[in-house]
Swiss-Prot record:
It catalyses: L-lysyl-[histone] + S-adenosyl-L-methionine = N(6)-methyl-L-lysyl-[histone] + S-adenosyl-L-homocysteine + H(+). Probable histone methyltransferase required for embryonic development. It comes from Caenorhabditis briggsae. This is Probable histone-lysine N-methyltransferase set-23. Zn(2+) 3 binds at residues 33, 64, 70, 77. PANTHER family: HISTONE-LYSINE N-METHYLTRANSFERASE SET-23, HISTONE-LYSINE N-METHYLTRANSFERASE SUV39H. Zn(2+) 2 binds at residues 27, 41, 64, 68. It is found in: Nucleus; Chromosome.
Length: 241
């Protein structure tokens, strides 16, 4: 299917410019950003990334942005990884059973950034509309679920019309990648794909699409061929679950 290539997630139907432009104030760091130096963009007990750019934090990960004082430093802030884009050589290829997929053309270390799952950030009504319009085709919409106290917040990212190489990663019940919720200086997050173990040259990249909300034998068969394969691909009860 034809789609427009983009490098990072952009606002789409159902997401207002006011919401998209709801940005954080930014840090006032005068040296390298870190927990030790009390960078305000780091909200956990550890730095977001190691010195060599591998992910350390696992929740509420906020990268520094153009609103931060560290932008004026003569060296690159190490709290900027996802926004710097894809650094690894990746290739789209045709699989024998699963359509297109993505493979690594160079080694990827555990916890290294692979790519963003870039697409349009859309509202729930637009998710439902697109599912109806494209009901005979595969559903690409990724739902990010976050919990703040008792409140659940969902963010919908759809690369169907505008996206990047991340849309071609297939599901595996024993994946070598995983998705993290990352904020690039604004409240609305994006989805970043990181390696969850060492990945060899020529290995297909995959992540777990999630827990299925539907049981039964009418679901699409999983073809990951892993030892712990769950037999069927995950399916949601509704488009916005």
């Amino acid at each position: 299917m034809n789609y427009e290539e983009i490098t990072t997630t952009i606002p789409g139907p159902g997401v207002s410019q006011d919401d998209w432009n709801d940005e954080f104030q930014g840090c006032d760091c005068e040296t390298q950003c870190s927990i030790e130096n009390q960078c305000s963009c780091m909200t956990g007990a550890t730095d977001n990334y190691s010195e060599d750019g591998r992910i350390v934090a696992t929740s509420l990960l906020i990268e520094c942005s153009t609103n931060c004082a560290c932008c004026l430093l003569p060296y690159s802030c190490r709290n900027k990884v996802v926004q710097n884009g894809i650094k690894k050589k990746l290739k789209i290829f045709s699989t024998s059973e699963k359509g297109d997929g993505v493979l690594a053309e160079e080694p990827i270390q555990n916890r290294e950034f692979v790519c963003e799952y870039a697409g349009e950030c859309i509202g729930d009504q637009e998710v439902k509309r697109r599912c109806e319009v494209f009901k005979e085709e595969d559903n690409y919409t990724l739902t990010l679920k976050e919990h703040f106290g008792e409140k659940e917040v969902k963010t919908f990212i759809d690369p169907r019309l505008r996206g990047n190489i991340g849309r071609f990663l297939n599901h595996s019940c024993d994946p070598n990648c995983e998705i993290f919720v990352v904020r690039l200086g604004r409240m609305i997050p994006i989805a970043a794909i990181f390696a969850k173990r060492e990945i060899s040259v020529g290995e297909e990249l995959s992540y777990d699409y999630g827990v299925s909300g539907i049981d039964g034998d009418n679901r699409k068969l999983c073809l990951c061929r892993s030892e712990n394969c769950r037999k069927y691909l995950p399916m949601s009860v509704s488009p916005i679950e």
